[in-house]
Amino acid sequence: XXXGLXIVDAFVQPNLILQGDAKVEDNGXL
């Protein structure tokens, strides 16, 4: 998420940090 877990999102989707962040925030609120 972008709200402080951007690093985690970067590991989840290193090629789609912004999009992955948005999806994680939207689906899991991470």
Swiss-Prot record:
- One Gene Ontology MF term: carbohydrate binding
Q: Does the keyword Repeat apply?
A: no
Keywords, comma-separated and alphabetical: Alpha-amylase inhibitor, Lectin
Q: Does the keyword Transferase apply?
A: no
What is the documented function of this protein? Lectin and alpha-amylase inhibitor. Acts as a defensive protein against insects.
Assigned protein family: Belongs to the leguminous lectin family.
Protein name (record)? Putative alpha-amylase inhibitor
